[in-house]
Amino acid sequence: MKLSDKTLTLLKNFSSINQSILFKEGSSLRTISVMKNILAEATIEEELPRDFGIYDLNQFLNGLNLHQNAELDFENNSYVMIREGKTKSKYFFADPSVIVTPPDKSIVLPTEDVSFTLETKELDKLLKAAAIYQLPDLSVIGEAGVVRLVVRDKKNDTSNDFSIVVGETEGEFGFNFKVENIKIIPGSYEVVISSKLLSRFKNTGFDVTYYIAMEPDSTFN
């Protein structure tokens, strides 16, 4: 079998959440960060023929790049054979017990208290601003009738910040994320936030959804 560019893009992103991954037979991909504060799940076009673990996903993907059009053979229980023309690589599976894996049960938000659409350009600008100004926090703030996304240093009242209005609200709230936890592929997202400090980012172009925990100092009135 071959992996599509779309699947490779997802796997590269998943490697930033957790360097290891346990693939499951079928077309579902799921991963969770070692700290268990980011969970991602996606559906891919390929049907994986077996369960197998990869300890260093980034290394595995870089190995695939040694081939222009790699064919993956999963006949062996211990490794995958990567072939193209006269070249081939043998890549051994990892013991599943050494991989931090998501719970089998699907994630359901306990409540759905705030929702908005985050467009591609808005996400890009927020993350660029956070990098330029070296800001560690992303806050979803509801006040004065609008929902704003703000990158800032919430511990420093005199820090630079950058904000974008993404919707309207009648509520007052301040949900805080660590910018380093916004490990999502570029694109537009339907975002839903629970006051129980869990959020869902559903990509509108890829079949991928992220569940990201918020900081305990978040507020919701």
Predicted features along the sequence, with ranges:
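DNA polymerase processivity clamps
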Residues: 1-93, 112-221
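Long, charge-dense
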Residues: 96-116
